[in-house]
Amino acid sequence: MNSRRKFIKNLTAVGATVPLVANIEAKPKKNKGPVILCSRGEVWGEKVLKPGWDILANNGKLLDAIEVSSNVTELDPEDTSVGYGGLPNEHGVVQLDASIMYGPTHNCGSVAALEGIKTPCSVARLVMERTDHIHIVGKGAQNFAKLHG
């Protein structure tokens, strides 16, 4: 039978090891280059990823590659998942959401309920790069997008 004394003693021992474990650094794996993923499978994969890979192959910026690849889907009227071909809400209005994140700086930007703009990923990137905000929604997101071209 465990006593309270034994429980507290064991708890203290666990608590003392946490700082030791926290100071252990993970060894990063060797970078084998960027990875761009597409959840659209074989049918859409090459179409979506090729523009991004072309940018990276010419020593372009990773965020440019991600944005351009996202724009392919957003601008395709036959893709009903996001963007121009996105399905309207219950009021018959297409509202789009997007977010973008940049690992090295931990910066991010996002928009939601964006109307009348075909490339929400590009607007999300503008939010990340040109504001102190992380998330802009609705009419505010639309006004921001129009203000930035």
Can you name each region flagged by the protein language model?
Residues 2, 9-17, 27-149:
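Alpha/propeptide regions of enzymes that mature by internal proteolysis
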